[in-house]
């Protein structure tokens, strides 16, 4: 006859094996999860659209990514510039694919990103820490930070010289204007707004960015 003690020990061993198996699966899933390759900044630079040019914006991306444990990758801001030597945002973000901070692939490549075959929306867009951003569609209709600095047309190209759409190539915190995207893909409560070309900002100042539903945030992409 098998003793009760032996039955108990066998049961404990089985439970332990099942638990270890479960932990192994979780570890394997974590190992298979793609690394973060894109995020919306949790905070802006704090000086309106004066980001210190592309160099300053890239440095901000790198700092935030490093603080979130992703500093081993090279990060670039999704921003265009205008005028002589104009830069297209789509040309400075690598080839993809890009996953968010929780491992969901947001876009496979630049074409899927710019031709509306991506997961760029409020549900999936996260900051570098894996958090969502304030939006009117999250239950607080009076507060939103969905405006994102891009200075970019829907296809990822720079605007032609003329009307300022980059706040003097990201060096102005007063006069001028920047093209903004809607990170939640909503215009108030209406879906379908563009993530990178929704409307120009009132000006380049921090108060005006905040007044229309922003905080000086922008997108950051890993290029490697």
What is each stretch, according to the model?
Residues 1-12:
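Bacterial N-terminal signal peptides that target proteins for export
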Residues 25-224:
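Secreted/extracellular ectodomain signature
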Residues 10-21:
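Bacterial N-terminal signal peptides
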């Amino acid at each position: 006859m098998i003793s009760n003690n032996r039955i108990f020990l066998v049961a404990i061993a089985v439970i332990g094996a099942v638990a270890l198996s479960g932990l192994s699966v979780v570890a394997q899933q974590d190992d298979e999860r793609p690394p973060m390759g894109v995020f919306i900044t949790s905070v802006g630079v704090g000086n309106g659209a004066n980001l210190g040019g592309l160099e300053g914006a890239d440095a901000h991306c790198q700092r935030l990514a490093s603080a979130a444990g992703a500093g081993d990758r090279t990060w670039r801001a999704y921003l265009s510039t205008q005028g002589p030597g104009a830069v297209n945002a789509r040309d400075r973000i690598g080839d993809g694919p890009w996953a968010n901070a929780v491992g969901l692939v947001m876009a496979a490549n630049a074409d899927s990103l710019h031709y509306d075959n991506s997961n760029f929306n409020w549900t999936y867009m996260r900051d570098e820490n894996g958090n969502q951003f304030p939006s009117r569609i999250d239950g607080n209709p009076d507060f939103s930070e969905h405006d994102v600095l891009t200075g970019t047309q829907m296809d990822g190209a720079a605007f032609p010289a003329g009307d300022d759409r980059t706040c003097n190539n990201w060096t102005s915190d007063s006069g001028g204007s920047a093209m903004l995207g809607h990170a939640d893909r909503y215009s108030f409560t209406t879906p379908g707004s563009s993530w990178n070309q929704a409307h120009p900002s009132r000006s380049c100042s921090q108060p005006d960015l905040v007044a229309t539903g922003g905080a000086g945030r922008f997108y950051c992409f890993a290029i490697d």
